[in-house]
């Protein structure tokens, strides 16, 4: 898939609405306390291909039963389908929503039970606070 001006630069994810599903990045636990105390954020470059039909959550996972989960539905619902956009979510918002940022094992989790089709080119940490948001829980 070509994404954001880069050939084969993105991945498309689809949820059918037939039950819960998620996409995540997982690895060894990281201590992100310093990042969450500062102005760091999680940056997503995305194209909405089909608007969400249900609650869509963005989370940071910190082990079994541990996460900080935010409602990304309003942000995605405002996007124009087919248009590339960026969103930055403050790491402190995930901490305030319950994530133990001293042991982050999933720095990106996106889940929904509804229909959704979304393409991503970038999922990364950003130190630039400009435009960063804190979605509702």
Model-found features: residue ranges?
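Short, surface-exposed loop/turn motifs at beta-strand boundaries within globular domains
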Residues: 6-8, 35-39, 103
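Extracellular ligand-binding interfaces
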Residues: 13-97, 114-131
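Noncatalytic modules at the cell exterior or secretory-pathway interfaces
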Residues: 96-106
